[in-house]
Amino acid sequence: RISAKHYGIPSTGNGRRESFRQMPIPRMRATYMEAGNVTEEEMISTVKKGIYASSFTNGQVQIGAGDFTFFVKDGYLIENGKLTQPIKDINIIGNGPRALADITMVGNNYKMDNGTWTCGKDGQSCPVTCGMPSALVSKLTVGGEN
C-alpha cells in the first residue's frame, strides 16, 4: 500500500516476501501476454537485421521509470528474414512501456515458462511465473547498439 500511495496508483496486492522472516515488499509475481495470429517464421521473415532470443537470464528493472536490462542466454542473429549465426550473452536494454508500444507482431505460439524464474529484491528471492508467445519488438538497444 505504501508504494502504491507513493506512485499515486491503486494497490494491486503484489506485496510478497521470501519467508515469514522478512517484511513484504512490492514485486512481480506473474507476467503473461495473450497469443497473436502469426507464426514465428512469419515474424522472422519480416526482419532485415535483428536478434531472435531463445532464452533470457539475469534481468533487472528500475521500478517507476520502467527501464530494464536482460541478458539473452542464447539465440540467433536474424539477417534478411533468416536465422543465421548463434548468439549468446547479449545485453538488451529498454523501457517496459515503450517496448510494449513497439511490439509490431505477436505469435500464435503461446507457452508457459518452465518455472525457474525468481524475483530478487532487497536480498529476497521469490518464485515468479511467465507465459507468452513470440513477440516482435521493433526498437530495443542490443549490446549497446540501437
Task: List PLM regions with ranges.
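N-terminal small-residue-enriched
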Residues: 1-146
